[in-house]
A protein has these predicted regions:
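Non-catalytic signal-transmission and effector/linker regions of two-component phosphorelay proteins
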Residues: 1-6, 105, 113, 117-142
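Conserved acidic segment of CheY-like receiver
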Residues: 4-15, 20-24
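Acidic di-acidic motifs
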Residues: 11-12, 55, 114
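Short hydrophobic/Thr-rich beta-strand motif most characteristic of the beta2 strand and flanking loop
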Residues: 28-36, 43
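His-Asp phosphorelay/catalytic-motif detector in bacterial-type signaling
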Residues: 48-50, 75-81
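Active-site beta3 strand of CheY-like receiver
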Residues: 48-54, 58
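Alpha4 helix (beta4-alpha4-beta5 surface) of REC/receiver domains from two-component response regulators
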Residues: 62-66, 89-113, 119, 123
Length: 142
């Protein structure tokens, strides 16, 4: 895989984080976990992460949505791919790349539903990291 990719996971369920992090670490990724949305967002701002895995429902409600929107508004952080991991796909309109922007959509690059299938998780993480690397290479060559 070359250099080890750093992933940040923001989810308030330690048991879920432990299972998902083990799958990712066993696949060769470095995983940092934050269980509080504010700590997670601060870690993302100060760390050098290649991908964010983000839960929607945390703490006082749909705080993951607020984090995704903050990331979308930040000129540096918006380049970080976001993989939403949630059990509430039907209740929220997610915005995927290439779709028209609507104010109620949540910006993200991909979504996976809980419970997470390990092979699907690894497939989506790999695809997002490859797409991000390709975008960075294109940006740097211009």
């Amino acid at each position: 895989m070359g250099t080890q990719k750093r992933l940040l996971m923001i989810d308030d369920d330690p048991d879920f984080v432990e299972v998902v992090a083990k799958v990712l670490v066993d696949a060769g990724y470095e995983v940092d976990a934050k269980y509080n949305p504010d700590e997670g967002f601060n870690a993302l701002k100060t760390g050098d992460y290649d991908l964010l895995l983000l839960d929607v429902l945390m703490g006082r409600g749909a705080e993951g949505i607020m984090i995704a929107r903050k990331i979308g508004d930040d000129p540096v952080l918006r380049e970080t791919p976001i993989l939403i991991i949630t059990g509430m796909r039907e209740q929220i309109a997610f915005l995927f790349p290439g779709q028209p922007v609507h104010p109620s959509f949540v910006p993200n690059d991909e979504l996976i539903e809980k419970p997470v299938e390990p092979d699907l998780l690894l497939e989506k993480v790999s695809a997002l990291l490859e797409a991000s690397a390709k975008r960075k290479a294109e940006t740097e060559s211009n």
